[in-house]
Amino acid sequence: MPPFLLLEAVCVFLFSRVPPSLPLQEVHVSKETIGKISAASKMMWCSAAVDIMFLLDGSNSVGKGSFERSKHFAITVCDGLDISPERVRVGAFQFSSTPHLEFPLDSFSTQQEVKARIKRMVFKGGRTETELALKYLLHRGLPGGRNASVPQILIIVTDGKSQGDVALPSKQLKERGVTVFAVGVRFPRWEELHALASEPRGQHVLLAEQVEDATNGLFSTLSSSAICSSATPDCRVEAHPCEHRTLEMVREFAGNAPCWRGSRRTLAVLAAHCPFYSWKRVFLTHPATCYRTTCPGPCDSQPCQNGGTCVPEGLDGYQCLCPLAFGGEANCALKLSLECRVDLLFLLDSSAGTTLDGFLRAKVFVKRFVRAVLSEDSRARVGVATYSRELLVAVPVGEYQDVPDLVWSLDGIPFRGGPTLTGSALRQAAERGFGSATRTGQDRPRRVVVLLTESHSEDEVAGPARHARARELLLLGVGSEAVRAELEEITGSPKHVMVYSDPQDLFNQIPELQGKLCSRQRPGCRTQALDLVFMLDTSASVGPENFAQMQSFVRSCALQFEVNPDVTQVGLVVYGSQVQTAFGLDTKPTRAAMLRAISQAPYLGGVGSAGTALLHIYDKVMTVQRGARPGVPKAVVVLTGGRGAEDAAVPAQKLRNNGISVLVVGVGPVLSEGLRRLAGPRDSLIHVAAYADLRYHQDVLIEWLCGEAKQPVNLCKPSPCMNEGSCVLQNGSYRCKCRDGWEGPHCENRFLRRP
């Protein structure tokens, strides 16, 4: 084999081994801007009189796979074109050894027809005769095109490895008023693409492999040249620095080696040192400027607070992915409340064992807790101390009552490093962590030390911890699994320890910490998420006095749960002469508001139907639209004397089939058969002899509810999808498959197709 053919074969082999996903173009912008470029490409729409001809390279150097990507790019561009005989006309050529007209500009009058025809294009193979294709268009024009008053656009999709000279025919085309876009595919030769493209080159040279970026660039140029206005007025075209890369084989000097050289003059062969070279694959970089359109996004104003992540949803909507403690509000601005007076000292491990990353996470945890809990009328005072070799009180307890000032002061606390002397820090915190002016007697607030650490202590902790607890300090520990045993020894109880598995899980401990600060070891499952609806029989058979007993019982039960949008949500439905929602799941986000609403629930009288009330809960209470949370256990507690329950068995089973537990509290000396059928399983029925005895069965009810709250859930039961959308389980989550005309995460938005 001749040497040059051998080299060519080696080059082809090496090029074929390079994965096509290598970054052949890089726009130097942030990930957020890249997302905006991608989003804008889907919103751009060209509706003007213009003739657009695609010229697709179908040669062997492109290959069948890259030809399919070229077709995908052309189809994506067509998605943004108002194709009709009067507006945008589209045609297509394929070229290799010879040019082949796939369809002229006047063949199809709808977008669907054009896209379907492009999909049917078949790869031909052959040489890359770009020059012949351009000359064909020079001699015959754009087939099916209109007169010169209509802008003519030629979009050439090629790898730029033509076997002829393309500069002259492309120049002549441009002189005739044809706007030429050169779109690279596979490993493009950018020099040839620049020779093909119209001026300015940065606006007319694109890369088909990055289809959304290329589509955006093409429509941005059309907008800038006033061919068609493809974006909304508030969108803007901006120039960004970018790089184009070309994969080439280059010869590299490798050294000298002994060789023999002949001389014609002496007819002798002489020993000498000859240079030798190696071939190497390299990316050659071409600096460029890329022009792209971006539109204002709903997340530009940073609406999500407290570390929440803003996720755009369409043009104007957004969703905040909030840490657990802040998930109850649209902007992660949930305010938890403390129902006791407390002096709180956060004790942060600033030793080398925790590391700088761990220390910074602890500071963020304190910031988020402070934002969630403190307010102008808060009865909590907060301080912060750090420790390694010794204790440093960085923010004395109560120094700041203004939340922004307190958060700002936390930013200035430095990481110190050094040994982890937790025992010494606990002793010093007990002695001087709360200052010397602490009130005594009943007027003194509860004093709490919250220790945050990820490393084992290098000194003894049991004695200092006992010393701190003897001074009436409540010790709470927050740490990784590795230090659980040590934290339990320090706090004196496993119930005073909060362990996290990863950095995000640390922030999920905020509501649990808030609950422990004022809790007195009440029964219940205060940190378990639950959607709970009480259904009260307020028919004439119950009577106003017994209804008041039921209200008192519901208030007492609800107090055993942490009522806020991140943990337990409570709703109340009453039924008698009619069915009425006293309050929905997401309408009373605090315990105080919920208790007031329970007391204000109306007594209806009349004849009640438990079945109708259960269907009301199924249709109008336990739904995503009314505040029910996907992935959270759900339960309904029915309190009734038994009358009107004859029609309730089927509706109750409907609730159970959709993942909603139903417990019946039947009151009266004898339970009716209808009430037994309503209850279903025997463990879903609590029999109470009289309304006055309800309070004696509270613990049994709470235990049952806590058990239900810990059961695994099916994210699609009840379905979170609206407007008859179908819920599909997928990779531990779910997605909603929407009917035609609806879109959105829960099929909540009506989708109007463009004409």
UniProtKB/Swiss-Prot annotation:
Q: Name one GO biological process term.
A: calcium-independent cell-matrix adhesion
Query: Gene3D superfamilies, per this entry?
Result: Laminin, von Willebrand factor, type A domain
Q: Which residues form the signal peptide?
A: 1-23
Q: State the compartments where it is located.
A: Secreted
- Expression tissues: Expression is generally absent in normal colon and other normal body tissues, but it is induced an average of 78-fold in Stage II, III, and IV colon cancers, as well as in colon adenomas and colon cancer cell lines.
The superkingdom listed in its UniProt entry is: Eukaryota
Q: Which residues form the EGF-like domain?
A: 296-333, 712-748
User: Cross-referenced CDD domains, in alphabetical order?
Assistant: EGF (cd00053), EGF_CA (cd00054), vWA_collagen (cd01472)
PTM note says: A 55 kDa form is produced by proteolytic cleavage.
SS bonds (residue pairs): 299-310, 304-320, 322-332, 716-727, 721-736, 738-747
Domain VWFA: residue ranges:
51-222, 343-517, 531-705
Q: Which UniProt keywords apply?
A: Disulfide bond, EGF-like domain, Glycoprotein, Repeat, Secreted, Signal
Site feature Cleavage, where: 267-268
GO CC, one annotated term? extracellular space
Q: Which residues are glycosylated?
A: 147
Q: Which InterPro entries match?
A: ECM_Assembly_Org, EGF-like_Ca-bd_dom, EGF-like_dom, VWF_A, vWFA_dom_sf
Q: SMART domains from the entry? A: EGF, EGF_CA, VWA
Which molecular-function annotations from GO does this UniProt entry contain? calcium ion binding; identical protein binding
Supply any other comment.
May be used as a serological marker for colon neoplasia.
Please give the subunit comment from the record. Forms monomers and multimers.
- Tell me the protein's name: von Willebrand factor A domain-containing protein 2
This protein's species is Homo sapiens
